[in-house]
Amino acid sequence: FGFAWPEELECSRLVNCDETAPATAPVTTNAHGTQKTPGQTRRDYGFWCPRHLHTSNGQGYKFLGIDQCAPPCPNMYFKNYELDVAKSFIGIVSIFCLCATLFTFLTFLIDVKRFRYPERPIIYYSVCYSIVSLMYFIGFLLGNRTACNKADDKLEIGETVVLGSQNKACTVLFMVLYFFTMAGTIWWVI
């Protein structure tokens, strides 16, 4: 195409971060054909756990390969405004879905005999998804309280993500949400 590679992107001009010794050091070749420099040391540019993300021993936390380190609960990827809009949207949609599914179920209760087999699974589907929307609404109301550990200024621990079943409310919320989502999906197939 006639384009020249830009000088700024020439790889030979860039410093290699994994370089273990200066480029001027003598290089020797071992029996396997790999090069080795004298006094070769490895620099570690990896992740280290900040003090406010450290957890006590025995909790089983592991974040980015570091033991006793928990992921932070505050947003890392989105602005606060974007999170507020997303949370508000989930809350509003969950209320709308809860109203729609409860309306369907209450319509069924008016005349139960009217809904025979082809229509009956829709009622079960509606009940399942009314509970799913209720779980989303409860999660919206609780905010980060179920998914995040509280910060402790005395221990210098920041707000971190809950691991596994350490928070019973988070576990119950997830289990009910998962069960009724799967049940609703199965009723949709039937």
UniProtKB/Swiss-Prot annotation:
Membrane keyword on record: yes
Amino-acid biosynthesis listed as a keyword: no
Regions of this protein lying in the Cytoplasmic compartment: 111-121
Molecular function, one GO term: G protein-coupled receptor activity
InterPro entries to which the protein is assigned, alphabetical: Frizzled/SFRP, Frizzled/Smoothened_7TM, GPCR_2-like_7TM
Stored SMART domains: Frizzled (SM01330)
Compartments where located: Membrane; Cell membrane; Cell surface; Apical cell membrane
GO biological process, one term: Wnt signaling pathway
Transmembrane residue ranges: 90-110, 122-142, 170-190
UniProt domain comment: The FZ domain is involved in binding with Wnt ligands.
Purpose of the protein: Receptor for Wnt proteins. Most of frizzled receptors are coupled to the beta-catenin canonical signaling pathway, which leads to the activation of disheveled proteins, inhibition of GSK-3 kinase, nuclear accumulation of beta-catenin and activation of Wnt target genes. A second signaling pathway involving PKC and calcium fluxes has been seen for some family members, but it is not yet clear if it represents a distinct pathway or if it can be integrated in the canonical pathway, as PKC seems to be required for Wnt-mediated inactivation of GSK-3 kinase.
Name this protein carries in UniProt: Frizzled-6
